[in-house]
């Protein structure tokens, strides 16, 4: 069914109070959006970090009398009579179907294609990874995933062991296996990611060569010829002592999930253990690669 949304602009400090006010006025859900499209990364545990200039959006049933909603909100001390707002009627959509319709096969490097599992492959002779991300991150559409896939495609992975640290949907580990790796190991803190990776591995016929672990279950002595970690700059810095010991001597490391402005600090965390290559950038993101000393 169609919906009505009411949008308010406020400061991050007042956003939670206005969220409560919208719920009390009958909103069925609340969304926070940055007015200026400024990214927020890596909040502290338990922290809900909001932008300095925040849009608070309440979603209402189409039958709601919005004049009554506005009258209720005018009594709020942060708003008052005649407060600025915007009301829009939203078209009813099958959002899952719309997302699926807009997810098309994508090529990375010379050989590799990532294809939605519900679409035909564009090149039968290419290295095709059939993907259904489910509830986990990783479709290839994000610049960081794209950077990692292009890097993997550029390598000779024949017979190699690959670790995908923070595997999400399993896209990188599965791509490595399809590109010739003998074995891949996926590690993620999210059980849903482990399940999504397992499902995608089965879909691609590589489940017998993919090991999946939550961090608490991973073997103590794990080594690989290639290690790729597409997470975020903060965890990459904090986990550098752990990640740095995973590649064998002479092994390769690929890191992403890093803003270009964060590259220097991440490089510093790995410089003692790796001979690092020049940083590669895509949009505002980057990839760091190197060889183990």
Curated annotation (Swiss-Prot):
* Molecular function GO terms recorded: protein-lysine N-methyltransferase activity
Supply the alphabetized keyword list.
Answer: Cytoplasm, Methyltransferase, S-adenosyl-L-methionine, Transferase
Q: What class of enzyme is it?
A: transferase
Q: Which GO terms describe its biological process?
A: methylation
Q: Mind naming one GO cellular-component term on file for this protein?
A: cytosol
Pfam families found in the cross-reference section: PrmA (PF06325)
Recorded catalytic activity of this chain's protein: L-lysyl-[protein] + 3 S-adenosyl-L-methionine = N(6),N(6),N(6)-trimethyl-L-lysyl-[protein] + 3 S-adenosyl-L-homocysteine + 3 H(+)
Cited Gene3D superfamilies? Vaccinia Virus protein VP39
Localization of this protein: Cytoplasm
Give the EC number. 2.1.1.-
Keyword Heme included in the entry's annotation: no
Q: What does this protein do?
A: Methylates ribosomal protein L11.
| HAMAP family given in the database record | Methyltr_PrmA
Q: Which NCBIfam families match?
A: prmA (TIGR00406)
The name on file for this protein is Ribosomal protein L11 methyltransferase
């Amino acid at each position: 069914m169609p919906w009505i949304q009411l949008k308010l602009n406020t400061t991050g400090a007042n956003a939670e109070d206005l969220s409560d006010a919208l719920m009390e006025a009958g909103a069925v859900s609340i969304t926070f959006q940055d007015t200026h499209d400024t990214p927020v990364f890596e909040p502290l545990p338990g922290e809900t970090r909001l932008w300095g200039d925040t849009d608070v959006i309440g979603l209402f049933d189409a039958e709601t009398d919005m004049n009554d909603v506005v009258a209720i909100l005018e009594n709020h001390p942060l708003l008052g009579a005649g407060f600025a707002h915007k009301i829009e009627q939203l078209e009813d959509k099958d959002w899952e179907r719309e997302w699926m319709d807009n997810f098309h096969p994508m090529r990375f490097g010379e050989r590799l294609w990532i294809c939605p599992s519900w679409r035909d492959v564009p090149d039968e002779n290419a290295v095709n990874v059939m993907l259904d991300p489910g509830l986990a991150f990783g479709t290839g559409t994000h610049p960081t995933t794209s950077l990692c896939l292009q890097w993997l495609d550029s390598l000779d992975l024949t017979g190699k062991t690959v670790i995908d640290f923070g595997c999400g949907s399993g896209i990188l580990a599965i791509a490595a296996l399809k590109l010739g790796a003998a074995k891949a190991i996926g590690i993620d803190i999210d059980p849903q990611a482990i399940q999504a990776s397992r499902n995608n591995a089965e879909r691609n016929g590589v489940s017998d060569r993919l090991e999946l672990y939550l961090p608490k279950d991973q073997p103590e002595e794990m080594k690989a010829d290639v290690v790729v970690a597409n997470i975020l700059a903060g965890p990459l810095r904090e986990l550098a002592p752990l990640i740095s010991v995973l590649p064998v001597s002479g092994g390769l490391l690929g890191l992403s999930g890093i803003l270009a402005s964060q590259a220097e600090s991440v490089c510093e965390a790995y410089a003692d253990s790796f001979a690092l290559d020049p940083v590669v950038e895509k949009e505002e993101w980057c990839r760091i690669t190197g060889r183990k000393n």
